[in-house]
A protein has these predicted regions:
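Mg2+-dependent phosphoryl-transfer active-site scaffold
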Residues: 1-160, 165-193
Length: 193
């Protein structure tokens, strides 16, 4: 099977337009996540390589945030070494990244990535929150702030763009949804191109 390109996926979306409104599919479809967890992703854009399949088998995304993280970790070379840390965090719950969970708002900012700093937007939100803390709160959490800001500075060049990878994940998810739920239509399209 020939690998899917972005233009092919857009053509697939047009191909199924009479059957389903791809813009309104649920993002919690169990059949789709089962397909992704099995790495049955031939014909699913950005998830067809052996490397991507390996990462899917390891992470086994159960929701959209985990799929976004999986794609960000797989497709950002500077983030890929962190995939094993992410796996440990994902599997060992509750996980407390050193000092990151001491400040409630920081914990909330990182909840979509299981408490791990993955995205530039998370770093920006953390910096913003720290800048709005009272002097008393800054003194109370001084050590946590020091460790958090040091970690952000250390990882600055490796962090991914959350909005970019969320958009990519949505594109991949919709492609996988069609394969999982409209299998005959999917293969009809695949064989016709």
């Amino acid at each position: 099977m020939k690998r899917m390109k972005e233009i092919d996926v857009k053509a697939l979306f047009a191909f199924v337009a009479d059957v389903i409104n791809i813009e309104n599919i649920p993002l919690d479809d169990q059949k789709t996540y089962n397909l992704l967890a099995r790495a049955d992703t031939d014909g699913v854009y950005m998830l067809e390589s052996d490397w991507d399949k390996y990462d899917l088998l390891q992470i086994q995304p159960k929701d959209f945030d985990e799929l976004t993280a999986c794609i960000a970790l797989s497709h950002n070379p500077s983030m890929n070494p962190y995939i094993y840390t992410y796996l440990k965090i994902q599997k060992v719950k509750p996980f407390t990244f050193p000092r990151f969970s001491e400040i409630d708002e920081v914990r909330n900012i990182l909840k979509d990535s299981h408490g791990m700093l993955l995205y530039k937007e998370q770093a920006e939100a953390i910096y913003y929150h720290i800048s709005t803390m009272s002097n008393e709160d800054k003194k109370e959490h001084a050590m946590a702030i020091k460790i958090i800001t040091r970690e952000i500075e250390k990882r600055k060049g490796t962090l991914s763009e959350h909005t970019f990878f969320r958009t990519r994940a949505l594109f991949c998810y919709r492609n996988a949804f069609i394969k999982a739920n409209l299998t005959e239509v999917f293969y009809s399209f695949i064989t016709s191109r």
